[in-house]
């Protein structure tokens, strides 16, 4: 008779679980990649954007300066962007700020994904896409910080609007729209588009219609009573201007992407789960790779050279401007203008001006301001 010691107990099989813990780790890894990528790109490649935008505006700590922004819807959003942009004289600060904003955007839209489509395989894909698209937009020197803050605010308000809550909670959220309109300006229309699309797919048209009723009343009151702003300001300010982009359709495609963002999430959920799981596995990596390729494709060394020249020119470093232009031979009109003025300041214009390119005749010696501005805008500073 065999003893109890001879009886072998069945061993438990070890299984690798892919539960909430692994998803949480995956999420934090993606956030770390977004932050690191943005910090690296804007610190080492697109840091000239910080110099340009910091010099473009003068922030003044005064009630008069603040009142100029507080007197119109969306003004405080631009004011906040201007305030934060004053630290752009330090490239590390600028890169850290941009990276933080992009990471916050990804976090907010990830939360939206989890509410709209809980358990979806694409919960990270669309959040990374939203952050990456705005990262690409920021490579334009005239695309400012408050533009990304506006999309962030629209996402936060939408997140609050679709959060689980009773009838009273939703009425309260709808009633807060005038305040949101005052803070975010025309980014309210992005939010209205998002909430309308979500209401349509979820068959909650009354909820979306309520926002449009409040929006219409708010618009009339702001136009006729409170702010007396022109329709163009109420309907578009402070959205990014299309004039700063070679292909103006890029801006409208950006707006449409965020407006139909909830619809994209819901449509993707109709895929077969086994197929979507396979597709979603590498989708985040593909988005990151595409973003990196497009940012480096849009990068121009001529832009870097031009703004380094401008930085030395504003610092009255005439020798530095002369040496840099003669070394790099930049053919941009503004670069040649800085070079010739520096030669004139050193008394060497007649003897040394042909040591560097002179492609524009007298234009590179005395350039009208409007031509100087248009030249800078057209010298590959814009997303093509």
Regions found by a protein language model. Give the residues of each.
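Hydrophobic cores of alpha-helical transmembrane segments in multi-pass inner/ER membrane proteins
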Residues: 2-3, 100-107, 151-163, 188-199, ...
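Single conserved hydrophobic/aromatic residue that forms the stacking wall/gate
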Residues: 377-384
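Membrane-embedded alpha-helical segments of integral membrane proteins
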Residues: 205-272
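Membrane-interface micro-motifs in multi-pass membrane enzymes
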Residues: 55, 70-74, 94, 98, ...
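Membrane-interface coil-to-helix junctions
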Residues: 40-96, 101
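Internal/C-terminal transmembrane anchor helices
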Residues: 276-300
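Membrane-interface segments at or immediately adjacent to transmembrane helices
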Residues: 296-370
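Transmembrane helices and adjacent periplasmic/lumenal helix-loop junctions
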Residues: 141-145, 163-205, 216-226
């Amino acid at each position: 008779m065999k003893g109890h010691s001879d009886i072998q107990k069945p061993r438990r099989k070890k299984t690798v679980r892919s539960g909430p813990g692994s998803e949480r780790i995956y999420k934090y890894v993606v956030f770390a990649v977004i932050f690191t990528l943005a910090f690296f790109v804007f610190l080492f490649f697109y840091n000239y954007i910080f110099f340009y935008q910091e010099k473009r505006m003068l922030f003044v700590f005064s009630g008069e300066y603040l009142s100029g922004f507080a007197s119109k819807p969306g003004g405080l959003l631009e004011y906040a962007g201007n305030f934060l942009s004053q630290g752009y004289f330090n490239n590390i600060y600028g890169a850290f700020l941009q990276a933080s904003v992009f990471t916050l955007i990804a976090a907010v839209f990830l939360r939206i994904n989890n509410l709209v489509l809980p358990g979806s395989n694409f919960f990270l894909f669309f959040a990374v896409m939203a952050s990456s698209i705005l990262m690409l937009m920021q490579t334009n020197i005239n695309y400012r910080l408050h533009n990304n803050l506006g999309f962030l605010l629209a996402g936060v308000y939408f997140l609050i609007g679709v959060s689980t809550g009773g009838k009273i909670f939703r009425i309260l959220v709808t009633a807060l729209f005038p305040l949101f309109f005052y803070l975010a300006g025309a980014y309210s229309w992005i939010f209205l588009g998002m909430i309308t699309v979500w209401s349509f797919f979820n068959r909650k048209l009354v909820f979306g219609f309520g926002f449009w009723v409040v929006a219409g009343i708010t618009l009339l009151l702001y136009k006729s009573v409170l702010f007396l702003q022109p329709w163009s300001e109420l309907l578009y300010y402070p959205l990014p201007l299309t004039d700063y982009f070679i292909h103006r359709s890029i801006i409208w495609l950006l707006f449409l992407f965020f407006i139909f963002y909830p619809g994209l999430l819901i449509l993707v959920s109709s895929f077969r789960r086994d197929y979507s799981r396979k597709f979603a596995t590498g989708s985040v990596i593909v988005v990151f790779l595409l973003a990196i390729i497009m940012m480096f494709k849009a990068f121009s060394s001529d832009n870097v050279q031009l703004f380094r020249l401008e930085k030395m020119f504003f610092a009255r470093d005439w020798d530095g401007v002369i040496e840099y232009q003669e070394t790099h031979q930049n053919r941009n009109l503004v670069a040649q203008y800085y070079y010739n003025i520096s030669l004139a300041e050193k008394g060497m214009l007649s003897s040394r001006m042909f040591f560097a390119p002179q492609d524009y005749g007298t234009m590179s010696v005395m350039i009208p301001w409007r031509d100087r501005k248009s030249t800078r805008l057209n010298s590959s500073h814009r997303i093509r």
